[in-house]
Amino acid sequence: MRDEDFCCAVCLDFFVEPCIIECGHSYCRFCIESHLNINEKCPLCRAHTGNPIRNRQLESLTMSYVSSRNISTEYYERMKSYQKKLLLQNRALVIIWTELNKRPGHSTELCNLVRNVQDEELKSEIMWQVKQQVGVGLEHTGDLQEENVTIRLKNSSSQQ
């Protein structure tokens, strides 16, 4: 067995919570979910795909392989880091979409989304996710580098 057999094609590191998608390719959960937030195609073959499914067999094999190579400490640290990133990403997306769905057809300023958020990491992630979602599910007016940019659900401007 080789390292490449247990590596994600997105992050090029050992799988963390590997998931398989419809075309048969496997990725780290964080990597594929982050990718699918902005593009619904497989990063390798570009086939359309649905929700990733956790691949517990590959996860077990990866953990065994990592343990046999005596690099499990670094692997588990990376796993904890990915889980934290995924939680942060999910929290940011919930804040964005909840706010925009409260008043369908209306827009909101990015500063309103982050105004009551105390956690600087979460604020940063909200701003990052807004930039990632523009063109996919969001439209904007103003400079995306500024907090006073106005965002709305894509194609909702005709409803105002």
From Swiss-Prot:
Zn-finger segments (RING-type): 8-46
Protein name, entry field: Uncharacterized RING finger protein T02C1.1
Keywords linked to the UniProt accession: Metal-binding, Zinc, Zinc-finger
Species in which this protein is naturally found: Caenorhabditis elegans
UniProt entry tagged with the keyword Translocase: no
One matching Pfam family: zf-C3HC4
SUPFAM superfamilies: RING/U-box (SSF57850)
Example GO molecular function: zinc ion binding
